[in-house]
């Protein structure tokens, strides 16, 4: 508790000292600025001192030269802007044109959507006209014609002759099999009849 008054006094003294220092520095700055403004001389006054008495024409010449210089500076500063602005506009137009060309859609998707009946549409830029890629079995400008398969006569003739030969061979084989079975049966019957006749003869002789 005893330290608090001493700390407060120290802070108060430090604040007073800083206020005094800042006030002195501000006064010094003000004095320096006042001295500088009093020593400065305007350029018109210096030129007036250099010019002889009665030199009004010289002043007019200097004023005209300064005005010409100002005009030249203004023209020089404005010309690059005039040259630069058209180039930017032209670049923007070119970019827009390029974007427009890239966004062009295929005419086959809209205008010639139903041009090809049995095929796919393809737009030829060189001819500026659509063309069709026909599906297999169709032909024509719009793939509207159906192409029928053409049979070869020689091929059909060979096919029929082969079928006829096969039929004849199969029929002949069947006939041979049937004849063989009949002959086998006939021979078997003949042997059976001979045996029966012999048995009959033996029975007759035995009865006697």
UniProtKB/Swiss-Prot annotation:
Post-translation changes: O-glycosylated.
Compositional bias per record (Polar residues), positions renumbered to this chain: 37-49
InterPro entries referenced in this protein's UniProt entry, alphabetically: EGF-like_dom
Gene Ontology MF terms: epidermal growth factor receptor binding; growth factor activity; heparin binding; transmembrane receptor protein tyrosine kinase activator activity
Stretches with biased composition (Basic residues): 93-102
Tissue expression pattern: Macrophages, midbrain, cerebellum, hypothalamus, cerebral cortex, bulbourethral gland, lung, heart ventricle, kidney, skin, prostate, seminal vesicle, testis; at low levels in lymph node, thymus, spleen; not detected in pituitary, olfactory bulb, thyroid, duodenum, pancreas, liver, submaxillary gland.
Record organism: Sus scrofa
Name of the protein: Proheparin-binding EGF-like growth factor
Chain ranges on the Cytoplasmic side, renumbered to this chain: 183-208
Coiled-coil features, chain-numbered ranges: none
Subunit record text: Interacts with FBLN1. Interacts with EGFR and ERBB4.
Propeptide regions on this chain: 24-62, 149-208
Keyword set includes Membrane: yes
Listed Gene3D superfamilies: Laminin (2.10.25.10)
Transmembrane segments: 162-182
Domain EGF-like: 104-144
Chain intervals for the UniProt region annotation (Disordered): 37-57, 81-104
